[in-house]
């Protein structure tokens, strides 16, 4: 009669007989710590006391890492290409995946029956935006495009082509929009801005480097021609092999067609208005000069 061998039986027996780990037998692995070379001080320890001959090394004033004695260091000589030119001033866009967006909708943190912008995404703890670290919004990436099934009116700052196709395939609408740093701070934290009773400022237009992106219909830019956007939607549907649903008869049609004015920060709130949090009222300006300033 043969004995039945249990998988891992010998290993379990060895572990049972090993001593238990306690504070008394904890020690570094062999070779993890090396003893520092003992060097003499003053007249002791040999001719040069283990510090070599004169100079910076003997006097414990070693040069910084990468210093080559005054000549142009290697990392400045080769290569001389502008791969990282102005890297400290380039805008950052933290990624937001379609999988994460669907997860937030399924949990009820984000209401798909209302337009979704950065205010909803931040309040739903979906993304973290830090303008002081040059964050200019979120970038929608196509991770989870095969499981995304929500019909949304979404506003982001950048989006990949496949992510745009995944949103429009379900009958949704996506817009890429730019916010200057002050407008971005107001958008992600509206309540602290409303508390002092300041008027809502105008949103600024993007600079020369970002203007081509937000005027391109293929990127669904908020400054692009609406007719060109409709043509780009049809071309993208042909490319990925799906048909665009007719939203004109949809119950959420009014929500899906909502758009922000390029100068507006919030949905339904115009520049120059003051939100009174204490009385829960909205104060609108009546002076012609003020209206002309905020309307321009």
Swiss-Prot record:
HAMAP family: Ribosomal_uL15 (MF_01341)
UniProt family annotation: Belongs to the universal ribosomal protein uL15 family.
One cellular component (GO) term of this entry: mitochondrial large ribosomal subunit
Name this polypeptide is given: Large ribosomal subunit protein uL15m
Record has Nucleus as a keyword: no
Residue stretch of the organelle transit peptide: 1-20
Keywords assigned by UniProt, alphabetized: Mitochondrion, Ribonucleoprotein, Ribosomal protein, Transit peptide
Chain intervals for the UniProt region annotation (Disordered): 25-59
Biological process terms in GO annotation: translation
Locations listed in the record: Mitochondrion
Quaternary assembly: Component of the mitochondrial ribosome large subunit (39S) which comprises a 16S rRNA and about 50 distinct proteins.
Pfam families: Ribosomal_L27A
One Gene Ontology MF term: structural constituent of ribosome
């Amino acid at each position: 009669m043969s004995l039945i061998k249990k998988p891992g039986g010998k290993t379990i027996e060895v572990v049972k007989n090993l001593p238990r780990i306690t504070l008394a037998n904890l020690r570094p692995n062999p070779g993890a710590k090396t003893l520092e070379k003992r060097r003499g001080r003053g007249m002791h320890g040999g001719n040069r006391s283990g510090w070599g001959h004169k100079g910076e090394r003997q006097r414990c004033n070693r040069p910084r890492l990468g210093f080559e004695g005054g000549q142009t260091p290697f990392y400045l000589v080769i290569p001389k290409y502008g791969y990282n030119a102005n890297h400290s001033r380039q805008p950052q866009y933290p990624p937001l995946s379609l999988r994460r967006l669907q997860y937030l909708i399924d949990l009820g943190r984000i209401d798909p029956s209302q337009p979704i912008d950065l205010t909803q995404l931040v309040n739903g703890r979906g993304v973290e935006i830090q303008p002081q670290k040059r964050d200019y919004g979120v970038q929608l990436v196509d991770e989870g495009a095969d499981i995304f099934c929500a019909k949304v009116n979404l506003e982001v700052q950048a989006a990949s082509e496949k992510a745009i196709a995944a949103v429009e395939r379900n009958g949704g609408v996506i817009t890429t929009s730019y916010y200057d740093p002050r407008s971005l701070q107001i958008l992600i934290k509206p309540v602290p801005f409303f508390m002092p009773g300041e008027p809502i400022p105008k949103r600024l237009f993007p600079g020369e480097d970002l203007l081509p992106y937000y005027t391109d219909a293929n990127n669904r830019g908020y400054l692009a021609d609406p007719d060109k956007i409709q043509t780009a939607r049809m071309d993208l549907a042909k490319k990925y092999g799906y048909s665009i649903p007719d939203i004109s008869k949809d119950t959420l049609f009014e929500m899906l067609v909502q758009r922000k004015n390029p100068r507006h920060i919030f949905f339904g709130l115009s520049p120059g208005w003051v939100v009174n949090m204490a009385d829960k009222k909205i104060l609108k300006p009546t002076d012609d000069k003020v209206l002309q300033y905020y309307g321009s």
